[in-house]
């Protein structure tokens, strides 16, 4: 059917529409029938019958190349190579990052970036993470699954890039752990003494669901941070950690955070110390479902000072932490909790 259209749209608009047509008949008709009469265009006998609207796809945070076509599915944070085709599935935070600097929730590079001192849902020197926190790696070069799986751990491993780690990091201080607690002496879901382990193991270098080193925090970090969790030189949080605490699912290093990563520069879903891993791996430079590097991000990353949902040297988060904090979990020079923390960490957040 042909319709006469007058002063209805611009040529460019129709051309845009024609791009979604099953054939070129519309655009060829436009080119053939539209007279150029200045700003006002008159369209005679323009074929508009077969135009279609672009399909709307739902993707929460899908970072793919535009040319990819994805089947409808729910992915909270799926970061794959553009050439990948994914079947519908649910992934809470699947983030792979081949680079030492990524971020997630994944936020586009800016979703949250952190540096020097940041904080964010996630923060890291430059990262941030997803509060979800899992699928993270930790260890000087390891990671673990918050649940502890989906992750590799070793001084340096991690699936492809699922997590990279290198240099040295720690996610959670020489002594941390989380879900596992680690302080020179803590334990928790995981226990860690200068060397313990738990769901996660941690030795002077462990990690936990989160690890913590003298100062990290997770979901929150603290050197001094705060965030959803707040952290302070000493903070506390949903979980608080003190000289040595831990929390749940949080790792903390001198300065990390968890759900957030923590290391001098890491982050985690959780990262962990010189050598830990977790669902998250962390190295001086890793990333994990989030990767973290000296500057990574993770669901939250944290660097010397970041915080995020996690906070580091100076951040705060859902969780607050103070030199001595307490919270849903309290931790003292040496405590543990669902989260353990070392010299200074806290959970759900590491420090």
From Swiss-Prot:
Residues 173-351 are annotated as: 18 X 10 AA tandem repeats. Residues 92-351 have a biased composition (Basic residues). Residues 24-47 form a propeptide. Residues 1-23 form the signal peptide. Keywords: Glycoprotein, Malaria, Repeat, Signal. Residues 124-153 are annotated as: 2 X 15 AA tandem repeats. In the intraerythrocytic stages of development of P.lophurae in ducks, there is a synthesis of a major protein that accumulates to comprise at least 50% of the cellular mass: the histidine rich protein. This is Histidine-rich glycoprotein. It comes from Plasmodium lophurae.
């Amino acid at each position: 059917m042909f319709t006469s259209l007058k002063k209805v749209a611009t040529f460019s608009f129709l051309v845009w529409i024609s791009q979604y047509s099953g054939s070129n008949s519309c655009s060829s008709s436009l080119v053939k029938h539209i007279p150029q009469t200045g700003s006002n265009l008159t369209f005679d006998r323009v074929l508009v019958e077969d135009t279609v609207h672009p399909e709307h796809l739902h993707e929460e945070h899908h970072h793919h190349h535009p040319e990819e076509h994805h089947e409808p599915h729910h992915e909270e944070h799926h970061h794959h190579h553009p050439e990948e085709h994914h079947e519908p599935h649910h992934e809470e935070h699947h983030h792979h990052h081949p680079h030492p600097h990524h971020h997630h929730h994944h936020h586009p590079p800016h979703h949250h970036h952190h540096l020097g001192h940041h904080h964010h849902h996630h923060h890291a020197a430059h990262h941030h993470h997803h509060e979800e926190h899992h699928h993270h790696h930790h260890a000087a070069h390891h990671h673990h699954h918050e649940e502890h799986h989906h992750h590799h751990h070793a001084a340096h491993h991690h699936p492809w890039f699922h997590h990279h780690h290198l240099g040295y990091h720690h996610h959670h201080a020489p002594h941390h752990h989380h879900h596992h607690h680690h302080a020179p002496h803590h334990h928790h879901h995981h226990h860690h003494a200068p060397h313990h382990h738990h769901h996660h193991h941690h030795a002077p270098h462990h990690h936990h669901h989160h690890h913590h080193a003298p100062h990290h925090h997770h979901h929150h970090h603290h050197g001094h941070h705060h965030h959803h969790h707040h952290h302070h030189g000493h903070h506390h949080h949903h979980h608080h950690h003190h000289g040595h605490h831990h929390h749940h699912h949080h790792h903390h290093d001198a300065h990390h955070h968890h759900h957030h990563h923590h290391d001098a520069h890491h982050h985690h879903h959780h990262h962990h110390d010189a050598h830990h891993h977790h669902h998250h791996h962390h190295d001086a430079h890793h990333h994990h479902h989030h990767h973290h590097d000296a500057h990574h991000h993770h669901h939250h990353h944290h660097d010397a000072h970041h915080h995020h949902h996690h906070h580091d040297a100076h951040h705060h988060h859902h969780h607050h932490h103070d030199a001595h904090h307490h919270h849903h979990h309290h931790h003292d020079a040496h405590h543990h909790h669902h989260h353990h923390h070392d010299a200074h960490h806290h959970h759900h957040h590491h420090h």
